[in-house]
């Protein structure tokens, strides 16, 4: 799908990755409906994008609230596509989460993208064009210590996107999943004040944003955004989970995961 003049809804717009996606989409001519929980940051972002606040709209929404996903789509009105980027950090041992925190993580990371797609997809099918992009993670391909809750949402989102892609194909609507690895300067490690594992490399918000554009313009099924070594490890983990678990135990994954979970505890 050509992005010029298309109107897209972007959730999670004010985080580091969200801002990069917004800037790249706007640079390719898209008109954006930007959403997050913070109005001031949304308005600042809209004003900084190509075309400015006159071209891009903002909607404040907390997708952890019941009914927020459907209301966001209603408020956004007629759109040509969705980039579902909003997510909550959810690293930690399962028993350390309250039931409310479990529900919030599932609602934001998994349920809300599904409900937004459910509301938007029929409209796109009627038009015979459009695109839905879901931002996942390498945690949707391979699990690691203290990732049970987070990985469950990302594994689920990946499967949902693949299934929906098949359903929407006859209607001319594209569906893509974009799975970043460790992102420097943004993402869960940056937000938690933790360092990603050494010697495995990182990617950038700009590369994630570029993958979103490629996914839409070329109707790509899945794009993994990570250095070659990281992609290789993830692929091994996906195909051989027992071997991947052994490698992670030898490589200090438990310590790294503990640091990450500690940094995320107040952000759930």
What are these regions (language model features)?
Residues 93-106:
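Substrate-binding pocket helix/loop in short-chain dehydrogenase/reductase
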Residues 28-45:
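Conserved glycine-rich Rossmann-like NAD(P)H-binding loop of the short-chain dehydrogenase/reductase
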Residues 137:
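Residue(s) in the substrate-gating loop at a strand-loop-helix junction
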Residues 117, 153:
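Active-site helix of classical SDR
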Residues 14-15:
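Conserved glycine-rich cofactor-binding loop
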Residues 95, 144-148:
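Active-site loop immediately N-terminal to the catalytic Tyr-X3-Lys motif
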Residues 177, 197-232:
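C-terminal helical subdomain
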């Amino acid at each position: 799908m050509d992005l010029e003049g298309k109107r897209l809804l972007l959730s999670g717009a004010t985080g580091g990755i969200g801002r990069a996606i917004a800037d790249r989409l706007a640079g390719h001519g898209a008109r954006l409906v930007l959403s997050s929980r913070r109005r001031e940051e949304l308005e600042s972002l809209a004003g900084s994008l190509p075309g400015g606040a006159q071209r891009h709209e903002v909607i404040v929404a907390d997708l952890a609230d019941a009914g927020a996903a459907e209301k966001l789509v209603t408020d956004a009105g007629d759109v040509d596509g969705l980039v579902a980027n909003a997510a909550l950090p959810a690293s930690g041992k399962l028993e350390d989460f309250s039931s409310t925190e479990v529900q919030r993580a599932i609602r934001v990371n998994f349920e809300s993208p599904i409900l937004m797609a459910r509301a938007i997809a029929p409209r796109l099918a009627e038009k015979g064009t459009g695109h839905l992009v879901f931002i996942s993670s390498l945690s949707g391909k391979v699990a690691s210590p203290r990732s049970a809750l987070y990985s469950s949402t990302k594994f689920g989102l990946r499967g949902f996107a693949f299934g929906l892609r098949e359903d929407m194909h006859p209607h001319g609507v594209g569906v893509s999943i974009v799975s970043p690895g460790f992102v420097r300067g943004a993402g869960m490690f940056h937000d938690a004040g933790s360092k990603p594992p050494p010697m495995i490399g990182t990617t950038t918000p700009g590369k994630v944003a570029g993958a979103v554009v490629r996914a839409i313009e070329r109707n790509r099924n899945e794009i993994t955004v990570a250095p070659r070594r990281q992609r290789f490890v993830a692929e091994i983990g996906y195909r051989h989970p027992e071997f991947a678990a052994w490698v992670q135990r030898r490589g200090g994954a438990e310590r790294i995961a503990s640091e990450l979970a500690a940094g995320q505890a107040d952000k759930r």
